[in-house]
Amino acid sequence: MVAPVWYLVAAALLVGFILFLTRSRGRAASAGQEPLHNEELAGAGRVAQPGPLEPEEPRAGGRPRRRRDLGSRLQAQRRAQRVAWAEADENEEEAVILAQEEEGVEKPAETHLSGKIGAKKLRKLEEKQARKAQREAEEAEREERKRLESQREAEWKKEEERLRLEEEQKEEEERKAREEQAQREHEEYLKLKEAFVVEEEGVGETMTEEQSQSFLTEFINYIKQSKVVLLEDLASQVGLRTQDTINRIQDLLAEGTITGVIDDRGKFIYITPEELAAVANFIRQRGRVSIAELAQASNSLIAWGRESPAQAPA
């Protein structure tokens, strides 16, 4: 009977000892976590410091009372600390990326904080980088378009100026050519006017301008209608010396007023431009021709005396 009682007492003492050890270990673990918790709060920086834990209420017998809701408070503090760390990391990452944007860096920042930044925040930063790159590309395209337009406008103005200068130069050359032609015609007219002198009763009388022009016209018409004229007869008809008549005919030939040839027998043969072209065509077609062949062909190509000569000018 005594043995079972001792067994019960020993079992009760063993259970009490186990409970005592369990409580002692729990208090030691709580005391060891409190310094570590204080160090973590100090490293968080900008994290708001949680309120102090309630002091332990003394228990009877001098033993401290267990803190109320200690585990819940510790978990809340850890969550707040992690949130603060994440915000600090994101702010630091964004500051780095903004600094790189100002320096012209197009790629997203890859720092030691990239592993801690959230995927959503990283996506926003990448979209911001893409928008910035698109704006820069559009601005570069606008600048290039402005440059090309300015270059085309400058080339167009240069071409317009070149055409204007060419037109002015062409007009100036045409004006000079007209003036030179008019000057030559006037000089030739004066030469002819001085050459045609009517000798009457041994006294030379110079014609007026109107008379000289009329006499020249009649002189040319007489040659054209006669076709073949003897130079001595022509000189006597117009009242000039034979040499002066020859000189006047040569001047008219040089001017292109009349066309023809002066043969070695002292005759002038007037040939129209059409007849001259027909003779030239005959020579080109036949190749080499003799004088006899040319003379024979001329009888059919040139109208010899078909027009009755007009009355010689008085």
UniProtKB/Swiss-Prot annotation:
The keyword Membrane applies. Residues 29-314 are cytoplasmic. The chain crosses the membrane at residues 1-28. Its main location: endoplasmic reticulum. It is found in: Endoplasmic reticulum membrane. Changing K124R: Weak or no effect on ufmylation. The keyword NAD does not apply. Changing K193R: Weak or no effect on ufmylation. Impairs some post-translational modification without affecting interaction with UFL1. Ubiquitinated. Ubiquitination probably triggers proteasomal degradation and is negatively regulated by UFL1, the enzyme involved in the ufmylation of DDRGK1. Residues 229-273 form the PCI domain. Residues 118-216 are annotated as: Mediates interaction with TRIP4. Widely expressed (at protein level). In the brain, highest levels in medulla oblongata, followed by cerebral cortex, cerebellum and frontal lobe. Residues 216-314 are annotated as: Mediates interaction with UFL1. One of its GO terms (biological process) is regulation of intracellular estrogen receptor signaling pathway. The modification Phosphoserine is found at S72, S114. The UFM1-interacting motif (UFIM) specifically recognizes and binds ufmylated RPL26/uL24, resulting in stable association between the 60S ribosome and the UREL complex. This is DDRGK domain-containing protein 1. The gene is DDRGK1.
